[in-house]
A protein has these predicted regions:
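Compositionally biased terminal segments of proteins
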Residues: 2-6, 11-13, 17-231
């Protein structure tokens, strides 16, 4: 999940889970039975590999009863968007659940890493990066946000997927002078246009320059209706 990094990483918040980073080490043979995520070769197609990683991690979180939601380009795909997936697979979890989520993935044989940024954890599945996000668009992941998630099929696996309005807000809010790649988000907006409460998204970030420019572009391309000015 792309996030605006124009400022330095903020200090760790009070009460944030203290997960120790995992040190990199050479791969060594192990004697235990292989875990399910290693039973098959990773797909050669990058988009399919990202999709398989999302399905695997989603199935692990769902099977362990965690509260979460799929986000990012795989969530756009689940809502009917393009199957051309970008960068990685993203999941939203509450900060308070980070330790338990990390334990579940570690038990399944995945290595969970703590990057310098304090708003996510990272792991790798089928050679693809998977981000576990505590914040979306500078907003904390909340119980209400996760409660709005929809249970949708991601290929053969059903899982909670971020609601279309929350998903578009998370894609648009980070736009700034240093992060303004409208292309992929425009494609997502076209795919999700009928599912999104656009006025809700506008109220969240439409007064800031780059999100406002994106809304103007959506209007000119007839993706959304022009905003009605009060009389």
């Amino acid at each position: 999940m792309t996030r605006n990094r124009e400022s330095a990483t903020p200090p760790r918040r009070a009460g944030a889970p203290r997960l120790r980073p995992v040190r990199e080490s050479p791969v060594q043979p192990v004697s235990r039975e292989p875990h399910a995520h290693n039973n098959h070769e990773p797909p050669h197609d990058r988009s399919q590999a990202i999709l398989e990683a999302a399905k695997r991690v989603g199935a692990l979180l769902k099977g362990s009863g965690h509260t979460f939601a799929l986000a990012g380009s795989v969530a756009v795909y689940a809502h009917g968007g393009s199957g051309h997936l970008r960068h990685d697979a993203d999941f939203c979890v509450r900060r308070a659940d980070a330790e338990a989520v990390a334990a579940t993935l570690t038990e399944a044989g995945l290595t969970v890493r703590t990057p310098p940024e304090d708003w996510l954890l990272k792991t790798t599945c089928f050679d693809q990066e998977v981000d576990l996000l505590f914040e979306l668009g500078h907003r904390p992941v909340t119980s209400d946000m996760l409660a709005r998630a929809q249970d949708l099929p991601v290929d053969s696996v059903h899982m909670p997927v971020l609601a279309a309005t929350d998903l578009m807000r998370a894609l648009i809010e980070p736009f700034s002078e240093h992060h303004c790649d409208f292309g992929p988000v425009l494609a997502a907006a076209r795919a999700l246009r009928e599912k999104v409460d656009w006025e809700d998204v506008r109220r969240s970030c439409g007064d800031r320059p780059m999100p406002a420019a994106f809304f103007f572009l959506l209007e000119r391309l007839n993706v959304i209706a022009p905003r009605k000015e009060p009389r």
